[in-house]
Amino acid sequence: MGKNVVVLGTQWGDEGKGKIVDLLTDQAAAVVRYQGGHNAGHTLVIDGEKTVLHLIPSGILRENVQCLIGNGVVVAPDALLREITKLEEKGVPVRERLRISPSCTLILPYHVALDQAREASRSEGKIGTTGRGIGPAYEDKVARRGLRIGDLFNPERFAVKLRELLEYHNFALQ
């Protein structure tokens, strides 16, 4: 049986987790991203080529490494698709090696609007958010009302849940 290695950060910032994971990836069969969003990035330099990743685990740049995005990650579909496209343009077979949990909560435009509006309304107590909707998406996840990746495969359910969410959040944006 293989062993599992877990890299945890406790500083909520640029601690070098990505670099450590990248160092360990040569010996890994899989790399799993279990939480977070596209607000942070990690830069990898492999064979002199620089790549910046925000959502996709760094193992994607290593042959034969499966990459998994777990349900604790909040996913901005537009950011994910941009990252996939950039990697595929470099010849990385992303679609063959990336698996995404259908339970991942989606970051939608209203999450971004809420995040930015809240930060703008704070006079002195700004928290320094990236304004990418991460916090509001996690609020929906914890409250069990968020749209998830799996909802994209059921258009009727997606439409009903989206309508409910827009009604819930629109009052805060008016």
Curated annotation (Swiss-Prot):
GTP-binding among keywords: yes
Keyword terms: Cytoplasm, GTP-binding, Ligase, Magnesium, Metal-binding, Nucleotide-binding, Purine biosynthesis
Record InterPro entries: Adenylosuccin_syn_GTP-bd, Adenylosuccin_syn_Lys_AS, Adenylosuccinate_synth_dom1, Adenylosuccinate_synth_dom2, Adenylosuccinate_synthetase, P-loop_NTPase
Cofactor (UniProt): Mg(2+)
One annotated GO biological process: IMP metabolic process
Entry EC no(s): 6.3.4.4
Active site: D14 (proton acceptor), H42 (proton donor)
Residues given in the record as Mg(2+) binding sites: D14, G41
Pathway(s) this gene product operates in, as recorded in its UniProt entry: Purine metabolism; AMP biosynthesis via de novo pathway; AMP from IMP: step 1/2
Top-rank lineage group of the source organism: Bacteria
GO cellular component: cytoplasm
Binding site for IMP: D14, E15, G16, K17, N39, A40, G41, H42, T130, R144
Main EC class the enzyme belongs to: ligase
Binding sites annotated in the UniProt record for GTP: G13, D14, E15, G16, K17, G18, K19, G41, H42, T43
GO molecular function annotations of the record: adenylosuccinate synthase activity; GTP binding; metal ion binding
Pfam families: Adenylsucc_synt
Cofactor mode of binding and number, as noted: Binds 1 Mg(2+) ion per subunit.
Catalytic activities: IMP + L-aspartate + GTP = N(6)-(1,2-dicarboxyethyl)-AMP + GDP + phosphate + 2 H(+)
Locations listed in the record: Cytoplasm
Classification via SMART domains: Adenylsucc_synt
Subunit structure of this chain's protein: Homodimer.
Record-stated family: Belongs to the adenylosuccinate synthetase family.
PANTHER family: ADENYLOSUCCINATE SYNTHETASE
Function: Plays an important role in the de novo pathway of purine nucleotide biosynthesis. Catalyzes the first committed step in the biosynthesis of AMP from IMP.
Name used for this protein in its record: Adenylosuccinate synthetase
Organism name: Stutzerimonas stutzeri
Name of the coding gene: purA
